Design a protein with these regions (language model features):
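N-terminal strand-loop element at the rim of the active site
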Residues: 1-29, 165-167
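Short hydrophobic beta-strand element within catalytic cores of glycosyltransferases
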Residues: 2, 219-222, 232
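Short His-centered aromatic/hydrophobic patch
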Residues: 46-54, 70
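Carbohydrate-associated surface elements
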Residues: 102, 117
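A conserved mid-protein helix/loop that constitutes part of the nucleotide-sugar donor-binding site
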Residues: 130, 134-153, 161, 166-170, ...
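Nucleotide-activated donor-binding/catalytic signature segment of Leloir-type glycosyltransferases, i.e.
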Residues: 170-185
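Aromatic "clamp/platform" in nucleotide-sugar-dependent glycosyltransferases that forms part
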Residues: 202
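Conserved acidic donor-binding segment of nucleotide-sugar-dependent glycosyltransferases
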Residues: 234-235, 239-246, 255-261
């Protein structure tokens, strides 16, 4: 159930592609009314600050069980900062799941840490080329401009940016000659076109894009933020870089571009093994069901 009607979005497109039923509410009041009409036996599981606050309050008033997953480690600014505070403050009305330890430490109540998870593709990407990618929302907290700056220091790389957002026009104007912007894409059709994923976020929880890339055998070079610090084993399945240090990331990207097939194959397999051992669907669904039954 989606809180607001934003028309056809990347998320609703994916829901349709997967054949998953969903309801789109017209506003917050409609969302709460629809939740309240659900049978008492229904368990509500919320994601995101708006659905979380409204869902927990509705569940409290109607006596329903509610579980909330907290994904973001970013406090935000302005109105978003207030919403983030309200989200954490109302966490006491729910059983809470945090996708990383740093996020769990920010919550005022005990929570269960369950990392994000992804399915394992049958075959990995080849990672034999020079295609470097950013995948995510083109907004300040994701730092897409830092990714675009890498292109100037890595002349042998082909830089591809996947995603939409408020910074798209500015990025296209400033970096369009060095970085190819693809807009939003169904990444299931794109991972085979990528050899290395770079994450330049200022804040993160545990981004699904990192898990998806590694499940495909694509190593990740990332700023050391949020749950990525625990996911990435530096120089084994990817690389960790001090946040904001673009030149240091460029050195690692250039190392990858110069590396031979043996090095790439070893790191690709290490990335897949990491996901298979700790971040696959089978590992996490049981943990979530345990929270439901607690």
């Amino acid at each position: 159930m989606l809180v607001s009607n934003h028309g056809m979005t990347p998320f609703t497109t994916l829901l349709k592609q997967q054949g998953l039923p969903y309801e789109v509410c017209q506003n917050s009041r409609d969302f709460m009314r629809r939740l309240a009409r659900q049978p008492a036996s229904v368990l509500i599981h919320t994601h995101g600050y708006k659905a979380g606050v409204l869902g927990r309050l509705t569940a409290w008033f109607t006596g329903k069980s509610v579980v909330s997953t907290f994904h973001s480690g970013d406090d935000g600014e302005g109105l978003l900062k207030f919403y983030s505070w309200l989200d954490r403050t109302t966490a006491r009305f729910a059983k809470c799941i945090a996708v990383s330890e740093p996020i769990a430490r920010k919550l005022p109540v005990p929570s269960t840490v369950i990392s994000n998870f992804v399915p394992m593709p049958a075959t990995p990407a080849t990672v034999t080329g020079n295609r470097i990618a950013f995948v995510g929302r083109l907004s300040p907290e994701k730092g897409p401009e830092a990714f675009c700056q890498l292109a100037a220091f890595c002349p042998d790389g082909a830089f591809h940016l996947y995603g939409d957002g408020p910074m798209k026009s500015a990025l296209l104007q400033q970096y369009g000659d060095r970085v190819q912007l693809h807009g939003f894409q169904n990444m299931a059709n794109e991972w085979h076109n990528i050899d290395l994923l770079c994450i330049t976020s200022r804040f993160e929880g545990l981004p699904l894009v990192a898990l998806e890339a590694m499940a495909h055998g694509i190593p990740v070079c990332t700023f050391a933020v949020g749950g990525l610090v625990n996911l990435i084993d530096h120089k084994s399945n990817g690389w960790l870089v001090e946040p904001g240090h673009v030149r240091d990331m460029a050195e690692l990207v250039n190392y990858w571009l110069r590396s031979d097939g043996v090095v790439r194959s070893k790191m690709s397999q290490a990335a897949r093994n990491t996901i298979a051992r700790g971040y696959s669907v089978n590992n996490r669904v049981t943990d979530i069901l345990a929270v439901y039954g607690a």
